[in-house]
């Protein structure tokens, strides 16, 4: 018995064209049936997260500008400046963390524990950023509406 026959016997009938073989079904979405490149997937995911982080960073910078323009007379000036500053610092930290996550090779089993820790850390920091931004939204950054009509 040759090794090729044993493989077919152990795994079922996987000869090209047989039912259930990768060659029997047409590829979905025009792609070939091949294993997922984990590094490529992780890099795309990190790039998407980085873009969202940049968008939130820009929004927080705009909010900080609006709060500073309102000045000290705004009721929630200090809490908003502190919360927005915390959010900005955490976002920069997550951005740097994502750069390190993209840098490492996921196929190296020796680095799996470190990558898992960094990924969990990034997820935790993103959760904290979301909570901080919920409070920023609750305090509000909009300018108060001024009465146009004179009071009598």
Curated annotation (Swiss-Prot):
Induction of its expression: By nerve injury.
Glycosylation positions in this chain: 60
InterPro entries (alphabetical): Ninjurin
Transmembrane regions listed in the UniProt entry: 79-103, 114-138
Ranges where the record places region Required to induce plasma membrane rupture: 40-69
Helix alpha2, as annotated region: 58-74
A GO term, aspect molecular function: membrane destabilizing activity
UniProt source species: Rattus norvegicus (Rat)
Region span, Helix alpha1: 44-55
Bias kind Low complexity: ranges: 16-27
Annotated site location: Cleavage: 56-57
UniProt keyword Hydrolase, yes or no: no
Gene Ontology terms: biological process: angiogenesis; cell adhesion; cellular hyperosmotic response; cytolysis; ferroptosis; heterotypic cell-cell adhesion; hyaloid vascular plexus regression; inflammatory response
Name of this chain's protein: Ninjurin-1
Compositionally biased spans, kind Acidic residues: 1-10
GO cellular component, one term: plasma membrane
Region described as N-terminal adhesion motif: 26-37
Domain of life: Eukaryota
Keyword Aminoacyl-tRNA synthetase: no
Ranges in the topological domain labelled Extracellular: 1-78, 139-152
Region Disordered, residue ranges: 1-30
Residues with N-acetylmethionine modification: 1
